[in-house]
Regions:
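Ligand/cofactor-recognition surfaces for anionic moieties
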Residues: 2-882
Length: 882
């Protein structure tokens, strides 16, 4: 089986983006040659793959011979000799003498690509771990391969020197690997790999607006000019299949209870049969049908859970560069953005649309969402203007959502004319509602005009290629109440790093800490003595420090701000009497980018740990002090005993588990833990600066009772990216290897900052699985996006598998549902065969691997047989294409 190389999926379509960019370049007068590029995204991607690609399993001698670019060995050696000596030696050590062995023919390095006049389209070279899997265990700072260096040197070198002579390069797809090559975090030297590879070639980088951290990485380490782009279309998940049938049956149950009690036992049995058919008894922790006395409580719980799943915001497709949403997509995106209170001028300026509607009817949206199964008598003013069941808080949410949609559809129909707001509100609700009108007025004057300017994405990409100034703008998640990050098409900036955490983030962080401790107390009856928290730079920038605030709150500290600058100047310890609980020991696994971007925050957290450890408090009031004392008794080194912040080797990035999972060479938790420790066993803090500290990391991790990762946006979820399973799942696997027992794994949800929740990792996985992964709405949306949509399906399966391998969160029934939805559904199967047969093979291969490894413990024999048949058919199809 092949070793697939996956990058994190972009939330845009690079193939279609390239088609649009080609058309815009041609219109602007660029020479695209005599043969025009394909005008279809799938056709372009298929042509690029046919030209060679990087999958050695399917690469043929004919493709190598016909490669667009051929770099003679002597030419490459001349370029290689210009690389600083230290990097040259490291490349020789790992990749041999130039030109190496990767993608070579007859001593030449070959590059797969498509050339259209003065424009060339290439696939970024592979990072190299798939080709050198032993490096996964030992070399997180693996240098680029000869092939990698050659590709960028060929782009840069003039034709007289054997190169293409590019004046600029555009990276399409978020994100690439160039900016993550080893070297300094900023202020790069000549021997830092990104600088050695890219040189002074201008880089223009369309990048999603909600990812300030990774975009900033490209700015800092690859001198990129970012042109930000919009988030994907969003929609409410709704119910489907057995979930929709259950909703109807619950309504029928309420009716027969009131009007025909004799039928109650029959309907109860039908409800339970459907619950079992949908595998919902796992979600609801009910293995047997509740008895008659408890069934009504079970129904309330079920109703509330269905409401929670259907109310999730999911992606309803992928963003297409410069495609301004209109019609139904704009209605859905406006509803998603208006769900959160709006932050304007650094303060909360307007309530969310649903929040304003709820208040107008004497309800509280947060209370409804907190107890969706609660029986309620809804106000007649609400039930008179919108039809639907009206017996529970979940019903109230549905009615309010329906009203919100009618309001937004009404405005969409009238072209968002500002002077129609009051009339639309009165027509839909039957009476004036000033607060609701204010939200719609804001949408008409600020949100929609900014969405209309999404076309700036292409205009400013071309402007950057013309050497023109790309206007700056803020970054963040629009659906978190940040309309000011729109319009897109700007060169985004992030945050003042010394203002982390902000006052608003402190409030959210305290809520996250309180929610986590309350959930653990409810689950176990006690407080956790030690918590492990994963902290990323992107999240810190997007939220202005929610995670940092949570760490401080768990320790029993709080920030001190300068009122004028809003910067954090230090921390203070909260007295135990005010805290009202023990101080929790916190171990933090930071990302490499966080290390680079927030060194002063690392110092702030380190100061907090050391101050709390030095407090004269009883062990049962200060778990951190107790643990530090135990370590001091063992080795006597205070600096080692108080090390609680661990991350990547200086100059390196990542957690290492993605290449390990993709290489398929791991066998047990010991392998997962080994890579996690090799890639993350470096201590940070005052006087540490990335000191190798594996033993101290393992000692700290062995105490972790709770492993936490927070999720601050619904624009993506925990199986949308490999980083979640690498960092969070990796932490779980590490603790399990060290102790023999998995820690409690939780996900903090602050996507709505005013309504923070904590779920177990299993609960969050099932919620995402039902709301998005096997939701026909999402699958159909991906089918609209061809090759890239199919890639998203395959990536989702990969990331679920990765989380299962590390944290054990995928049940057998979930694998069965994946196979049924992605491979056995005729429409989706045909889509994969036509648009991306490589994704079809990859999905099948991954599911078979899950069964082979016992992660999918007891697959149905018929399912396995169909998977094997699918795999063989897919192999044959791909062989026919070669």
């Amino acid at each position: 089986r092949s070793r697939r190389r996956r990058r994190r999926p972009a939330r845009a379509r690079p193939g279609v983006a390239a088609v649009r960019l080609f058309a815009a370049l041609a219109e602007a007068g660029y020479d695209l040659g005599d043969t025009p590029p394909p005008d279809d995204g799938d056709a372009l991607i298929h042509a690029l793959i046919a030209a060679g690609g990087h999958d050695v399993e399917w690469l043929t001698p004919e493709q190598l011979a016909a490669a667009e670019a051929r770099i003679p060995g002597a030419t490459y050696r001349r370029w290689f000799d210009q690389v600083p000596a230290e990097l040259r030696e490291r490349m020789r050590e790992h990749w041999g003498e130039p030109p190496g062995e990767l993608y070579t023919e007859g001593g030449d390095i070959v590059l797969a690509g498509l050339r259209f006049g003065n424009v060339v389209l290439l696939i970024q070279p592979p990072r190299g771990f798939g080709e050198n899997p032993i490096a996964i265990y030992h070399d997180p700072d693996l240098p680029p391969s000869h092939h990698y260096l050659a590709a960028y040197r060929w782009l840069t070198a003039p034709a007289a020197d054997g190169g293409f002579g590019a004046d600029a390069v555009v990276h399409l797809g978020k994100h690439g690997t160039l900016e993550w090559l080893p070297g300094k975090g900023l202020g790069l030297a000549a021997d830092c790999a990104p600088d050695a590879v890219l040189g002074d070639l201008p880089l223009v980088y369309p990048f999603i607006v909600n990812d300030p951290g990774e975009g900033t990485q490209a700015k800092r380490r690859a001198h990129a000019v970012v042109v930000d782009h919009l988030v994907p279309p969003m929609a409410r998940a709704e119910t489907y299949g057995d979930l929709a049938k259950l909703e109807q049956l619950l309504d029928e149950y309420a009716t027969v209870q009131a009007l025909d009690p004799a039928k109650v036992p029959t309907v109860r049995a039908q409800i339970w049969d459907l619950v079992r058919a949908a595998e919902l008894h796992h979600d609801l922790h009910a293995e047997a049908m509740p008895d008659a006395d408890d069934f009504d409580d079970f129904v309330l719980h079920l109703d509330g859970y269905l409401c929670e799943v259907k109310d999730v915001q999911i992606r309803d497709g992928l963003h297409i560069l410069a495609d301004a949403p209109t019609g139904e997509p704009r209605v859905n995106l406006v509803l998603a953005v208006l769900r959160a209170p709006q932050i304007w001028g650094g303060a909360r300026a307007l309530p969310g649309l649903r929040q304003a509607l709820a208040v107008a009817y004497g309800l509280d949206e947060q209370e409804l969402l907190a107890a969706p199964g609660q029986r309620l008598t809804l106000p007649a003013a609400l039930t008179d203007v919108v039809d639907g069941p009206a017996g529970t808080a979940a019903d109230a949410i549905d009615l309010i959502e329906a009203l919100a949609r009618r309001l937004v559809v009404g405005m969409e129909t009238l072209g968002w004319a500002v002077d129609t707001v009051d009339a639309v509100v009165t027509e839909v609700t039957g009476r004036p509602m000033p607060d609701v009108a204010a939200v719609l007025h804001f949408a008409a004057t600020e949100l929609v005009p900014r969405l209309d300017r999404t076309t700036d994405e292409l205009t400013n990409t071309l402007g950057a290629l013309d050497g023109r100034f790309v206007p700056p703008g803020p970054s963040g998640s629009p659906t978190r109440g940040l309309v000011n990050v729109l319009p897109t098409g700007r060169n985004f900036y992030s945050v003042d790093p010394k203002a982390i955490p902000s006052r608003n983030a402190w409030d959210v962080g305290v809520a996250l800490a309180d929610s986590l401790l309350a959930r653990h107390l409810a689950d176990t009856g006690g407080y956790p003595r030690s918590v492990g928290l994963t902290v990323w730079g992107t999240s810190a920038m997007r939220t202005q420090g929610d995670d940092i605030a949570e760490v401080l709150a768990l320790l029993g500290c709080r920030p001190v701000w300068d009122d004028r600058s809003r910067r954090v100047t230090g921390i203070e310890v909260v007295p135990t009497a005010e805290l009202g609980r023990p101080r929790v020991d916190v171990t933090v696994r930071i990302s490499g980018f966080f290390r680079d971007a927030f060194p002063h925050v690392v110092a702030l957290l380190d100061d907090a740990v050391r101050r709390v450890a030095a407090l004269d408090e009883p062990d049962e009031e200060n778990y951190l002090r107790a643990h530090v004392a135990a370590d001091l008794a063992e080795h006597g080194d205070e600096r080692r005993a108080t090390a609680r912040i661990f991350g990547s080797k200086p100059g390196a990035y990542g957690a290492g588990l993605l290449p390990l999972i993709d290489a398929r060479t791991w066998r047990s938790d010991a392998d997962l833990a080994e890579v996690y420790a090799v890639w993350g066993g470096y201590a940070y803090g005052r006087g540490l600066d990335g000191r190798e500290a594996r033993a101290d990391m393992e000692r700290s991790f062995a105490r972790i009772a709770v492993a936490v990762k927070n999720q601050d946006t619904r624009e993506h979820d925990i199986v949308d990216s490999d980083d979640y399973f690498q960092y969070h799942g990796g932490m779980v696997a590490m603790v399990r290897h060290l102790t023999g027992t998995s820690p409690q794994a939780y996900v903090g949800d602050s996507a709505m900052p005013h309504d923070v929740r904590t779920r177990t990792l299993g609960e969050e996985t099932r919620r995402v699985f039902r709301a998005r992964v096997v939701n026909p709405k999402w699958i159909a949306a991906m089918r609209r996006h061809g090759y890239k949509g199919a890639f998203e399906l395959a990536a989702t399966v990969d990331y679920l598998f990765g989380y299962d391998a590390t944290a054990g969160v995928v049940d057998d029934w979930m694998y069965e549902h994946l196979a049924a939805a992605y491979l056995f559904d005729e429409t989706t199967r045909e889509f994969l065969e036509q648009s991306n047969p490589w994704a079809l093979r990859g999905i099948t291969e991954r599911l078979l691997e899950a069964a082979d490894r016992g992660l999918w413990a007891k697959p149905e024999p018929a399912t396995l047989d169909r998977l094997r048949d699918t795999y063989l058919a897919s192999e044959g199809d791909l062989e026919d294409r070669v």
